[in-house]
Swiss-Prot record:
Species name: Trypanosoma brucei gambiense (strain MHOM/CI/86/DAL972)
Keywords: Cell projection, Cilium, Coiled coil, Flagellum, Repeat
Coiled-coil stretches: 613-657, 684-864, 903-1663
Each Sequence repeat, start to end: 1012-1025, 1026-1039, 1040-1053, 1054-1067, 1068-1081, 1082-1095, 1096-1109, 1110-1123, 1124-1137, 1138-1151, 1152-1165, 1166-1179, 1180-1193, 1194-1207, 1208-1221, 1222-1235, 1236-1249, 1250-1263, 1264-1277, 1278-1291, 1292-1305, 1306-1319, 1320-1333, 1334-1347, 1348-1361, 1362-1375, 1376-1389, 1390-1403, 1404-1417, 1418-1431, 1432-1445, 1446-1459, 1460-1473, 1474-1487, 1488-1501, 1502-1515, 1516-1529, 1530-1543, 1544-1557, 1558-1571, 1572-1585
Pfam families named among the record's database cross-references: FAZ1_C, FAZ1_cons
Cross-referenced Gene3D superfamilies: 1.20.920.20
Keyword Repeat: yes
Keyword Coiled coil: yes
Region of interest (41 X 14 AA tandem repeats of E-E-L-E-L-K-[VA]-A-E-N-E-K-L-A), ranges: 1012-1529
Listed PANTHER family: CILIA AND FLAGELLA-ASSOCIATED PROTEIN 58-RELATED, TRANS-GOLGI NETWORK-LOCALIZED SYP41-INTERACTING PROTEIN 1
The protein's role, per its UniProt record: A component of FAZ filament that is required for correct FAZ assembly and attachment. Not essential for new flagellum growth.
Subcellular location: Cell projection, Cilium, Flagellum
UniProt name for this protein: Flagellar attachment zone protein 1
Chain ranges passing through the membrane: none
Length: 1748
């Protein structure tokens, strides 16, 4: 059955027509997935029509992709429609819920106001009633329960408790002001049903009293409000719509990604299967049968389609699901195999048992047959076997009886221990109360009763309740009687009826008195609990403590009330309750602080552990990196050694060949007679070197002279390098000084801006004060003069700033020119570095060349040995593959070649001499150019010095301007003081208003001029920015010129290289490998060009990435600035609203004053003048506001309306603003929910974030490794340079070898006395050849030195290039900052549009870059930055939404106030139109300004709409990002689950393997035992067969004897026949008896076997039962409640534990009864841990989601 349960599972249900992905074995070797359309399916098999991979043409594939794009676009449209409908439904549901909440809130507020209006005296009368009405009691209980959120109040509280609660001061106010929406009342339906009954209805409450009626209404409205509020968050319809929206967004995202990839592939084109991007399928008619378990998933493809295209994401998802399916199938197969093995094992056991029974049956049958033929003497065998069987049974039953007794004893012990199990639970059963007594020995019990009566009572009740397994309230009527020797206690116990009084007494006597003993031992310890409360109350009320000793708290309260110290018992109890609550509050605060400390310590420990782990991982990584670096260095060293060896051997061979050629030419030998097509073999010894010594000395002297010249050049170059480094340092200092000056300039600009703001504020103050002191013409003239002075100072400061800006721009241009120069030199250095990188390839070529030289040398030796006229060389020839030492080569005689072109060679030598002269001239020109460069450097240093002086002067000028500005600020302060002094004279100058109006208008004109000047300054700043751009263009031109210069330098370097190549050709001209070397050189040049192109492309890519990063940073900075500007605008709008409110209040006051003054005709003119002045002030203030908001004023000019329609338009706008505010509230709610969801997602994706951080850390490590690799490459380049120096040293060593050869030549001179004549004839030619060789060597040395100088220059240029790049980056940043400053002066709306367009472009660029750089390590950092930016943008957008909502509210209030002002102004205009036409004109102006404000509001509304659209876009992006994060989280979870499953499967496999190994061992042992038993059985069978044959033979003999005796008896005597008959009868009887005996014996044996088998099972069951009973016994002993305190001192340790209690009322218990909760928990914890309660420390309670 178990195997059947494992096999039978619910199969996957598929419908015909569905497209599925399924697994199959390709070629029977590996798994492969494919698509198929379901044709039919049954329980285990599915028939599909297979889809094949499209192998058609590109046109077909493009057609498939286009059709797939159309399908995905249709799906996206469906998703969009579903999304819009879901959003509409969600908005409707939320609107409905919010309307319900607002209505319920309005009713609740009315009820609250109604309750608040009830008189406190009336409420006191209600609560002072002794027998109130039921409706009053129920309503007061409901109010108390609802305010405290405690349902037990309605069931457990008495009228006295309710009176106590309502007599507290401000109790009603506290109750009705409770947070109803904060906590949901659990039993709201019960209250509603009870209060809606007829006897407790609102009518009954209104009949009772007004207070009860108002409270009744408050309770019902509060419950309705609570229900409506809870509906906001618990409405399942909202979650359904949110899920639908999330599904739609996810679907849209998938469609969008697929469409993007399809479009990319469609644009790119390609083969039918693009490696990893797309996979195209075509439906076929081939039908396959596949098992149902091989189905991976259902693919979302239209069944009617004939073609489909899947992206790599969809394919990856299918592959992941396929892997999961395979793992599940493997797991299921392992379960099946395990179940099969178990069934097979069980079947094998049954077969073994059956075979054993069969053997026993056969054995018994044989015994029965054998017994039939035994003699009569053996008839007692069954009886003997029966006796033996009985004895065996008794021996078997004996342990059974012993085990039964043991089990019985164990059961008795377990029963006894289970009766004392400390984990008992009380059950509600019928109870009975019995009287009991208990005594405790001790002499100090009277002291305990006197000092701690309450603690003694609680301890005794707790202990006896635990002993009797009843609650504490079941221990009643406790009476303590203390004597000199013991404490006698009598008490009642309410226990279940099934327990008798004797059992209770037994429990009481057996239970250890731990708590009472501790009380007796700790009698002198401080009091606690109610005992301590009694002492504190006595001290608080100045009562004597000894008068209340031995009293309980209840008696104490009664005694205190009787003493009359406190007349009002209720007040006294309330004060005591307040004191106790204060104590509990203090204790709770201490616990919370302790818990906070513990949490902080735990967090600190966790952070420390994580930091240590990170450090350890970093150490390990560093160790690995160091090991890898060491390994690479060793490898590089080996390669260098090999290259050095090969280079030295090659140089020796080249030198030997060159010398052989020269000496053969000197000897004027004949040409080689051989094949002209092949290179001749050099076979002639050169012992005629006697006269070469002088020439060699000359060569050495010439080399020494050239070496000194090169050393001088190197020293000069070092000096130039030192000067360049000094210049670069000075340049860095100058750049730092420039940066500091730029920072100071920015600070000065900020200060100037602040001063301009101060000036604007001062002008506003002046205008306000001038409106009040319009008569002071002389003072106004002075103020005008001061303003002119300020303007002049400002102009001068601005002129100085502009001059500085121009100087700085010039300095920047110069620096950029130098930067371009260094960039060009850097390019040359890069080329040289690439040349060094190709040296390894040259090493390989040199090795091939060396092998060729070795082969040529061996051939030369062979040919020389074959030549009869030549003397053979003494050295033994070796194979050319073996390495030949340099000493051996140098010791061999030199061999020359046959040169029939000797005359041509001489001619060429002369030509090369001329070319060398030209090279000397060019070298001299290069030295001259170097000197010119040195002079230019000195000029640059002088210019830098002058620039530093100019910067110093500019700094001094800035300081002077700063002092001037401080003086101006002091003057401004003085002006402010003078203005304050002049305000006192305002009252006397009211009559001179008309004169001062013209002056004010002039000032306004001047202010406008100042604003225009500021605009001109802004335009000038823009012009400066354009000039900077022009300068940048000039710098680019200079860069191009520098590039040309660099190209010339490159040409010169190429010329030098060509000359060096020519020199090398001159040295190696006799070789026939010139063509090959030229080809190799061309290939190297091509490689260099390719490397240069690659380097340029890499630089371009790096520049593009840097630009993108800078653009991202700039965009982030611009967004932050926009947010700050929006905040500033919001603040300005708020200020404007406040000022408009103030003006509205002033206008109301003005209207009242006009109404009052209307009756007074004489004062009408004066009042009108005052009103005109006030209106002028209002107009001026509005003009100032318009000046402050010029950008907004330009937008507000579009909607000018008439005075009569303004009110209607404002009302319409107010309605629109209200709608927008509601929409914003909805959006804010949605954003809040999205923020909550984001927080949840962030909480869920913390692991992903950590993994991403780990990945980012790994990528950073990889980047660092790459940097290390780059540094190592640079080190390799430096080492190559060192190797070049070493090669030079080897050249010197070669020169030494030449000297040694010269010594050998001298020895040869002694031997060459016979050839003196020939030597004399060849001396001249040898001298000429030696001169040519020396000149060639000098040229080669000069070229090498020039190459080294170029390398040094390249290194210097690299450094300078790096510095210049840094400076260029800084200059670019400065230019970008200037451009940003210029761009900030544009309009806000244009900026927003541009930012939106830029953001879209950046989004597209980022997507393209993300697609291109998916495999780069920087993508993770960008993704992390994008997530952080999105989170910041979400926060910013939420803040903007809140601010916009506030602005809308303010604008609505402004619109309402403006409408009221318009109505007032219209009334005033109608009244005063007839009297003053001028006043009407001024009011019209004011109305026009108000129209501008209305237009401004409309513009703000439009901006809000734009913001809302942006917020929606951001929300969509956020949803997309959230979906991506969810996808990543799901993938990570799947991977984690897969890893866990794999780990579990591995563990299971390991465990299964171990089990199988153990079972195999057991099986082997069993097989061995069975084999032994089988052998024994075979032996027994043989023995039995022998016995049977013996018995048969004995029976035959016996039969013969009996027949003979019968014959004798018959023949002897017939009388014996009767006896024979009688004996036969007896024999038959005996045989029958034997048969019956055998049958009974067989039955008894079978019974014995069955009994033995049953006894074996019983014994095993008894053994397992005994083991379980022993375990239970140990467990019960561990949890026995009869434990006692240890008498010996043991080592103690403190551990921290957490216990969770379920429930939803723990918070109330924590706040209301903390001490009771603490004491109960301490008692339970002490009993559970078997320790005293004083060892339970640092207990803290935490309410977390209604669990503790």
């Amino acid at each position: 059955m178990a195997l059947l349960n494992v096999i039978s599972e619910n199969p996957l249900t598929l419908q015909p027509g569905q497209v599925i992905a399924f697994d199959h074995l390709a070629n029977g070797e590996h798994w492969q997935w494919a698509l198929g359309t379901v044709v039919s399916s049954d329980k285990h098999v599915v028939v599909v029509e297979q889809w094949a991979v499209n192998e058609g043409s590109c046109e077909t594939l493009k057609h498939n992709i286009s059709s797939e794009i159309q399908k995905e676009m249709k799906r996206m449209g469906v998703f969009q429609e579903q999304l819009s409908s879901a959003r509409d439904k969600l908005a409707a549901i939320r609107s409905e819920n919010e309307d319900r909440v607002s209505a319920a809130r309005a009713v609740f507020e009315d009820a609250k106001a109604r309750v608040a209006s009830v008189d406190e005296v009336h409420m006191r009368e209600v609560t002072s009633q002794a027998c109130p009405s039921p409706v009053a009691v129920e309503v007061l209980k409901c109010v108390l329960a609802l305010a405290q959120n405690d349902p037990t109040v309605t069931n457990c509280s008495t009228w006295d408790d309710i009176r106590m609660e309502y007599r507290r001061p401000n109790a009603i106010a506290d109750f009705i002001s409770a947070d109803i929406t904060g906590k949901t009342y659990p039993n709201a339906e019960e209250i509603c049903s009870s209060l809606n009954e007829q006897r407790l209805s609102s009518l009954a409450a209104s009949r009772d009293s007004e207070a009860i009626s108002s409270l009744h209404h408050w309770v019902l409205s509060a419950l309705a409000y609570q229900e409506a509020y809870c509906r906001l968050t618990t409405d399942t319809r909202v979650q359904e719509q949110n899920d639908a929206i999330a599904n739609c967004i996810a679907g849209m995202k998938g469609c969008r990604l697929k469409v993007m990839k399809l479009k990319e592939e469609l644009e790119r084109g390609g083969t039918p299967t693009f490696g990893g991007q797309l996979t195209s399928f075509t439906k076929t008619s081939v039908q396959l049968k596949a098992p149902l378990s091989s189905v991976i998933s259902i693919v979302g493809v239209d069944p009617s389609a004939q073609d489909c295209v899947l992206t790599d994401d969809e394919v990856g998802l299918i592959l992941d699901k396929a892997e999961q399916t395979r793992l599940q199938i493997n797991d299921h197969f392992s379960h099946l195999s395990n179940s099969y093995m178990e069934a097979m094992a069980e079947l094998h056991c049954l077969s073994m048992y059956t075979s054993e029974l069969e053997e026993r049956r056969l054995n018994l049958q044989e015994r029965f047959v054998f017994s039939l033929f035994t003699n009569a003497g053996k008839t007692n065998a069954p009886r003997r076997e029966r006796i033996e069987t009985d004895v065996g049974l008794r021996s078997v039953e004996a342990p059974r009886g012993d085990s039964a007794n043991n089990i019985k004893d164990l059961q008795e012990i377990i029963k006894e221990l289970s009766s004392h199990d400390e984990r008992w639970m009380y059950r509600n059963e019928p109870t009975v109360t019995t009287k009991h007594r208990k005594s405790y020995p001790g002499r100090e019990w009277s002291k305990v009763v006197e000092r701690k009566p309450e603690e003694l009572l609680s301890t005794f009740r707790t202990e006896q309740a635990a002993a009797c397994h009843v609650p504490e309230d079941a221990i009643r009527n406790i009476e303590f009687t203390a004597t000199s020797e013991k404490l006698q206690v009598s008490f009642d116990v309410q226990h279940p009826v099934k327990q008798t009084a004797a059992e209770i007494n037994k429990r009481l006597q057996e239970f250890p008195s731990r708590g009472m003993d501790r009380m007796l031992c700790d009698v002198d310890q401080p009091k606690k609990g109610l005992d301590r409360a009694i002492v504190e109350v006595c001290r608080a009320f100045d009562l004597r403590e000894h008068a209340f000793r031995g009293m309980t708290f209840d008696k104490f309260i009664e005694e205190v009330a009787m003493k009359g110290r406190v007349g009002d018992k209720d007040a006294y109890e309330s004060e005591i309750g307040d004191l106790l609550m204060l104590l509990d509050k203090i204790h709770n605060e201490n616990r919370s602080l302790q818990y906070t400390l513990e949490k902080s310590a735990e967090e600190f420990r966790r952070q420390t552990a994580s930091t240590m782990r990170e450090q350890e991982s970093l150490r390990q990584r560093n160790g690995e990196l160091h090991a890898e670096i060491g390994r690479l260095r060793d490898l590089v060293e080996k390669l260098r050694d090999l290259a050095d060896n090969q280079a030295s051997e090659l140089e020796l061979l080249k030198l030997q060949k060159t010398q052989a050629n020269q000496i053969r030419a000197q000897r004027n030998l004949s040409t080689f007679r051989g094949d002209d097509t092949a290179e001749p073999v050099y076979c002639v010894t050169l012992d005629e070197l006697r006269e070469q010594t002088e020439h060699c000395d000359q060569v050495e002297r010439e080399l020494e002279r050239q070496r000194e010249q090169c050393q001088n050049l190197l020293n000069a170059q070092d000096d130039l390098l030192a000067e360049l480094s000094g210049v670069s340092e000075e340049k860095e200092k100058l750049e730092a000084e420039c940066e500091r000056l730029e920072a100071e300039l920015r600070q000065m600009e900020e200060k100037s801006r602040l001063s301009e703001q101060g000036l604007s504020e001062m002008t506003q103050r002046l205008e306000e004060k001038q409106a009040e002191i319009e008569g002071l013409l002389e003072n106004l003239e002075q103020l005008d003069e001061q303003l002119e002075a300020l303007r002049a100072a400002e102009k001068s400061a601005q002129a100085h700033i502009e001059a500085r800006d121009r100087e700085i721009s010039d300095l920047q241009q110069r620096l950029e020119g130098e930067i371009d120069d260094h960039i060009k030199t850097t390019a040359l250095l890069e080329e040289l570095r690439k040349h060094y990188n190709n040296l390894e390839e040259l090493f390989d070529k040199q090795e091939a060349e060396l092998m060729a030289y070795r082969e040529k040398r061996q051939n030369a030796h062979k040919v020389r040995s074959l030549e009869p006229t030549l003397r053979p060389i003494g050295t033994q020839t070796k194979p050319f593959q073996e390495v030949v030492s340099a000493d051996e080569i140098s010791s061999e005689p030199l061999l020359s070649v046959t040169l029939d072109e000797y005359n041509d060679h001489m001619h060429r030598s002369n030509q090369f001499q001329q070319e060398n002269d030209l090279l000397r001239q060019q070298l001299q020109q290069a030295n001259d150019e170097r000197e010119n460069l040195h002079d230019r450097l000195e000029q640059l240093m002088a210019e830098n010095q002058s620039l530093s002086e100019q910067l110093h002067n500019m700094h001094e000028e800035l300081e002077r301007e700063e002092r001037d500005r401080s003086g101006v600020t002091l003057q401004n302060e003085r002006l402010a003081e003078e203005i304050q002094r002049k305000t006192a004279e305002n009252e006397q100058l009211v009559l001179e208003n008309n004169k001062s109006r013209s002056d004010i208008r002039n000032l306004n004109v001047q202010v406008q001029r100042l604003m225009e000047e500021l605009e001109l300054k802004a335009a000038e700043n823009e012009k400066l920015a354009e000039e900077l751009e022009l300068k940048a263009a000039e710098n680019e031109k200079l860069a191009e010129e520098l590039e040309l210069k660099a190209a010339e330098n490159e040409k010169l370097a190429e010329a030098l290289d060509l000359k060096a190549a020519e020199n090398e050709k001159l040295a190696e001209e006799l070789e026939l490998k010139v063509a090959e070397n030229e080809k190799l050189a061309e290939e190297l040049e091509l490689k260099v060009a390719e490397n240069e192109k690659l380097a340029e492309e890499l630089e371009l890519k790096a520049a593009e990435n840097e630009k993108l990063a800078e653009e991202l940073e700039l965009k982030a900075a611009e967004n932050e600035k926009l947010a700050e500007e929006l905040e500033l605008k919001a603040a300005e709008n708020e200020k404007l609203a406040e000022e408009l409110e103030l003006k509205a209040a002033e206008n109301e006051k003005l209207a009242e004053a006009l109404d009052l003054k209307a009756a007074e005709n004489e004062k009408l003119a004066e009042e009108l003048d005052l009103k005109a002045a006030e209106n002028e002030k209002l107009a001026e203030e509005l003009e100032l506001k318009v000046a402050e908001n010029e950008k907004l004023a330009e937008e507000l000019e579009l909607k000018a309306a008439e005075n009569e329609k303004l009110a209607e338009e404002l009302e319409l706008k107010a309605a629109e603003n209200e709608k927008l505010a509601e929409e914003l509230e909805l959006k804010a709610a949605e954003n809040e929910k999205l923020a909550e969801e984001l927080e949840l997602k962030v909480a869920e994706n913390e692991k992903l974030a950590e993994e991403l951080e780990l990945k980012a850390a790994e990528n950073e490590k990889l980047a660092e490794e790459l940097e290390l690799k780059a540094a190592e490459n640079e080190k390799l380049a430096e080492e190559l340079e060192l190797k070049a120096a070493e090669n030079e040293k080897l050249a010197e060593e070669l020169e030494l070898k030449v000297a040694e050869n010269e010594k050998l030549a001298e020895e040869l001179e002694l031997k060459a006395a016979e050839n003196e004549k020939l030597a004399e004839e060849l001396e001249l030619k040898a001298a000429e050849n030696e001169k040519l060789a020396e000149e060639l060597e000098l040229k080669a040395a000069e070229n090498e030195k020039l190459a080294e100088e170029l390398e040094l220059k390249a290194a210097e240029n690299e450094k300078l290039a790096e510095e210049l790049e840094l400076k260029a980056a800084e200059n670019e940043k400065l230019a970008e900052e200037l451009e940003l400053k210029a761009a900030e002066n544009e309009k806000l709306a244009e900026e927003l549009e541009l930012k939106a367009a830029e953001n879209e472009k950046l989004a597209e660029e980022l997507e393209l870059k993300a697609a291109e750089n998916e495999k780069l390590a920087e993508e993770l950092e960008l993704k992390a930055a994008e997530n952080e930016k999105l989170a910041e943008e979400l926060e910013l957008k939420a803040a903007e939404n809140e601010k916009l909502a506030e602005e809308l509210e303010l604008k609505a209030a402004e619109n309402e106030k403006l409408a009221e002002e318009l109505e007032l102004k219209a009334a005033e205009n109608e009244k005063l139109a007839e009297e003053l036409e001028l006043k009407a004109a001024e009011n019209e102006k004011l109305a026009e300004e108000l129209e501008l404000k209305a237009a401004e509001n409309e513009k703000l509304a439009e901006e809000l709409e734009l913001k809302a659209a942006e917020n929606e876009k951001l929300a969509e992006e956020l949803e997309l990002k959230a979906a991506e994060n969810e996808k990543l989280a799901e993938e990570l979870e799947l991977k984690a689950a897969e890893n866990e499953k794999l780990a579990e499967e591995l563990e299971l496999k390991v465990a299964e393997n171990e089990k199988l190994a153990e079972e195999l061992e057991l099986k082997v042992a069993e097989n061995e035992k069975l084999a032994e038993e089988l052998e024994l059985k075979v032996a027994e069978n043989k023995r039995l067969a022998e016995e049977v044959t013996q018995r048969l033979s004995e029976k035959e003999l016996l039969a013969e004897d009996t027949s003979a005796r019968l014959l004798e008896a018959d023949s002897a005597n017939s009388a014996l026949q009767c006896k024979v008959k009688h004996l036969e009868e007896k024999l038959t009887l005996l045989s029958s008896e034997k048969e019956t005996a055998l049958a009974t014996l067989e039955a008894e044996i079978v019974d014995l076997l069955t009994q033995l088998k049953g006894l074996n099972g019983t014994n095993s069951a008894l053994e397992s039962l005994c083991a379980s009973k022993e375990k239970e016994l140990v467990f019960l002993r561990e949890h026995c409640e009869l434990w006692t305190d240890p008498t010996t001192k043991k080592e103690k340790v403190i551990t921290r534990h957490v216990k969770v209690f379920d429930g939803n009322e723990w918070m109330k218990l924590i706040t209301d009864r903390p001490e009771a909760l603490m004491s109960a928990f301490v008692i339970d914890a002490g009993n559970a841990c078997h320790v005293p309660g004083d060892q339970i420390h640092e207990v803290s309670f935490l309410n977390n989601k209604e669990k503790h």
